[in-house]
Every structure is written in structure tokens, then in C-alpha cells.
Amino acid sequence: GEDDATGNIELTLVDAATGDAIDYAVALEIREGANNVSGNILKEIAVEASANGKCAIEELPIGSYTIQVVSADEKSEIVAAPFSVTVIAGQTITKPFSVTKIINDDQIRFVLRWGDEESGAPSDLDSHLVGPRVKGIGNFHTYYSDKTYEEYDDEDGYVKYADLDVDDVSWEGPETTTIYKQTAGTYRFYIYDFSDQEDEESKNMSDKSGAIVTVYRGSTLLNTFSVPTGQSGNLWHVCDYDSVTGRVTSINTVGYWPNDGSSTVGMSEAEVLRDSLSRKISDIQDYDFVLADNAYKANMKTVLAEAENLADNSENMDDIRAMIQKLEEIKNDIQSVGTIGNVKLDGEYVDWETIGDEDHYIVNGIRIMGVNNTPGEIEVAFTNTSDDPLEVRSEDVSGQDYIKVITVTNTVS
């Protein structure tokens, strides 16, 4: 019958910059055939602002169509963007689509979309942008754990250069990454299959995700990339963008990036080492406020200054590796004395409890139980992880020779 020769489409239009349903009017131009953006328009549909991005297209003859979303008025000012859809007899196709508003002419936007749960697509694909830093050596890297790259400027304060505007962890997208302020150099854009990161032979991103990346500049749709099929791996290198020439170059390859590689996606060996050194520096800096002001701490600060200089300026990978090892030893040294074996007050064993620094999971003090007056000489025996005595230190309560500050109170418990 007539109904068997037609099908329906239900659209949900979301704003690529927020991930929310659009609250402005747009227009749809429907053309016959896939990837057809210049032929005769079969049907035009207005989607009102009050529709919250919802639109039903009913009783379309079976076949393939291209639907182009365009601005309805000056308020919407969106970048015209097409997508293809196949109408199946007697069925209603549900389709989410991301709409991007016109951005500045010197801004670049990458929008990722992929399949839904029913399609068997991976639930979580992640967008990664690697690009040149404004200051210092190396590249910045924006992704779900470090969404914004910004630098401090004396006149303007913190300036945002790139941002993962929208992060989606449960199918479809959109995930949106924008270069807000360009720096001379090459930007590399990747998609990482977080769902299948442990499976080197997985083809889920390649064959099941249906992932598409659209690239915009200003009011122009520059490129549309589809993930290559039949490829094993968890990392899709989509494209490179040269900010000097303004050219987007298709890379479009899928390969494997090691498990737990989210923080290092797209980095060279040198960049991975610098990233590791920066994280070690951050780890040690976190201990600064729980350490006593003594020779040990002063030496640690000297080493940290050397490490920061290497991270910013050195091209010698052996020096960076050696510094990473040195900082790891400092961290182990601090943590190894976190277990207290026993406490003596004026030569007598006493009951005590630890005072922990919850932010860093270390002990930074003790409380002696049942003390009502000012304590005298204390002895604290630390042990290492194998419970062998590490060191016994005898010090007046006001002393500052401990690696960690030991605080003694007269609290009665």
C-alpha cells in the first residue's frame, strides 16, 4: 500500500557548543540522494524556536536524502551543514544532529558525532586536540581530563586558546572542540576509543561507530571526515590543521595507542617524557605544605627548580628521564615514612592516633592520647612498608627536624 512506500524521520537538533537542544529557529532543506547539497530542493521545513530542536518529517518516499540545516533568521546564524539519511518503508528513523553557530573567522571548531547504543557503537569516543603552546617548548593537549588550554597575559589575564566545549560519554555526541585563539604551527585532531582502549585488535570504532567529524571556520563548513572502515585500533588520527596556511589536511588513519594512553594521545616520545616530568613535579609540589621547613625540604625545592627548568627548556631526553627517576625517589622517600611504628613520651610508650592529610593520603601528624599537660621529649619510630624500623628520632615538640611535621596536642580522648 501507499504507507509501505514511505517512511518517517524524527530529528533532534542540538547546539554543538553546549550539547543542549537548540532554542532558536532553523530551516531544513531536503534534497533527493545522498551528499546532495546543490540540487533541487524537494521540501523546505521551518523548525520554530519553541520546538526545542524537535522536528518530524513524515511520509517521505523510501530512498536516500540529504538534509541541510540552514539559518532561519539573523538570530540563529548557524553554519549550513548537511547530513544524509535513508528512509525505510514503514519505519521511523530517529536522528540526532548537531548545529554549530557561526564562530569568528579566526576560530576553528571540530564536532564529533557517532552511533547510538542500538547500533553497537562504542559508548565513549573522546576528542583530543594537540597543538602549539604560546609559551615554552612542546604542545598543549585538550581532552576530557584537561579540557581547557589557557595562558596568562599581563594585560588580559587568563586567555583561552582552545577548549573541549562539550564532552559526551554515552553515545552519539556531539563532542565539540574549538580553537578560540590560534598560535602559529600545526594542530592535530584525534578520536580515541575509550570504550575499547584495552583491545589492540578492536574494530568497533572503525566498523560500528559510524563516527563523523565536521570541521568549521567562521561561517564555513571546511571538511567532513568519516572514520575509515575495516581498521583495527583505538585511535583515529582525523586531520591536521596548519594555522599559518589555514589548510586542513586529511590524515584519516586508525591505529593502536597503548592502554591508559588518554593523557599522551598524539604525543611524540619527547612530549610523553615531558608530560611525565610535569606530572611528577606536580606530585611533589603537592607535598610542600605538609613538610617541615628543614634541610630536606630546602633540598627538595632545589631539585624541583631544576626539574621545572628541564621541563621548560631541555631537549636532552636522558636528563629528563634521570630527573623523573629522582623525583620518584623523593616521592617514595616521603611516603615511606608515612607509617608510624610507635610513640614514646619521656621514655614511656603512649597511646596515639594519626592525623591524616586526606588530600594526599599521607600522615602529617600524631595526637598523643590522654595528655593533660605540656608534653616533654617525644620519640617517634617510623617504619617502612616492610615493617622494618626505618629511623627513630628524638626531638622536643617544638623541633622541626622531621621530614613531616609532627604535631602533638594535649587533647584528651
List each language-model region with its residue ranges.
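Conserved "repeat-terminator" motif of extracellular CCP/Sushi domains
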Residues: 1-4, 95-104, 326-335
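A short, amphipathic beta-strand motif
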Residues: 7-16, 108-112, 341-345
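Short, ordered, surface-exposed loop/turn motifs in non-cytosolic proteins
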Residues: 16-43, 122-126, 354
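Short, surface-exposed beta-strand/beta-hairpin micro-motifs centered on an aromatic residue
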Residues: 45, 52-59, 176-179
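A short, solvent-exposed beta-strand micro-motif common in secreted/extracellular proteins
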Residues: 61-74, 187-193, 307
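Intrinsic-disorder/low-complexity signal
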Residues: 91-268
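Beta-rich interaction/scaffold domains
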Residues: 268-341
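Asparagine-centered strand-capping/turn motif at beta-strand->loop junctions
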Residues: 372, 382-386
